[in-house]
Amino acid sequence: MNWQTWRHITKLDPDKVITKEEIAEIAASETDALMLSGTLDVTPENLAELYDNVRDAGLPLTVEPADPSCARFEGIDYVFVPSVFNAGHPAFITGLHKEWAQHADILWDKVVQEAYVVLNPNSSVGKLTRAKCDLTPAEVAAYGIVAEKYYSMPVLYIEYSGMYGDPAVTRAVSEALSTTRVFYGGGINSGAKAAEMGQYADTIVVGNAVYEAGPAVLKETVKAVK
């Protein structure tokens, strides 16, 4: 299994309700993987419940923990760990990571480091991390260069979190990087938007559309990039 070949990831929130029928439709959508991830009210308990519901979906399973308590390895193929480069609070850059490294038994061969740039100031993640979101495409691309050239991080994640972003940002980041993979997430709720961001991003991540528009729209976004 090679996550670097994935073009489409479906993000599911442990704090949101999803039915078995919807999970079956997601599994049939040809999305490349499931990412279990949320910003608020995610606990080891509701993460475990969501895992139990999707474990037999036949798709690669990943977790993107908001804090160390939800960094689950059992039954998980990869743990994508975000470091919010434009956070206003150092805990979300390296602080929580230090606590995790100090106190947890980490299976490092399953860890994928993500350099996050959060660009929606009204989102939960934007507020929680106090992210500086008024960045130009060139500034976001510069974060990407730091991630790739200085930290050798495998992922630069452009996160608009519920809001459709500026394709110029994704394009600028894509053109600036050569080895780091570009992930884009935020506001993709149609095939047209998936195609627009997918021409620049290596991987698009679709989350809210699953809950707001249903698996049929998810399938449309998959077809647009694969």
Swiss-Prot record:
Signal peptide: none annotated. One of its GO terms (biological process) is glycerophospholipid biosynthetic process. SUPFAM superfamilies: FMN-linked oxidoreductases. Keywords: Cytoplasm, Lipid biosynthesis, Lipid metabolism, Magnesium, Metal-binding, Phospholipid biosynthesis, Phospholipid metabolism, Transferase. Belongs to the GGGP/HepGP synthase family. Group I subfamily. Pathway: Membrane lipid metabolism; glycerophospholipid metabolism. Its cofactor is Mg(2+). It catalyses: sn-glycerol 1-phosphate + (2E,6E,10E)-geranylgeranyl diphosphate = sn-3-O-(geranylgeranyl)glycerol 1-phosphate + diphosphate. Sn-glycerol 1-phosphate binds at K11, Y157, I158, E159, Y160, S161, G162, G187, G207, N208. HAMAP family: GGGP_HepGP_synthase. It is found in: Cytoplasm. The lineage of its organism: Archaea, Methanobacteriati, Methanobacteriota, Stenosarchaea group, Methanomicrobia. Its main location: cytoplasm. This is Geranylgeranylglyceryl phosphate synthase. Its EC number is 2.5.1.41. It holds the Pfam family PcrB. Mg(2+) binds at D13, T39. The keyword Ion transport does not apply. One of its GO terms (molecular function) is magnesium ion binding. Prenyltransferase that catalyzes the transfer of the geranylgeranyl moiety of geranylgeranyl diphosphate (GGPP) to the C3 hydroxyl of sn-glycerol-1-phosphate (G1P). This reaction is the first ether-bond-formation step in the biosynthesis of archaeal membrane lipids. GO terms for cellular component: cytoplasm.
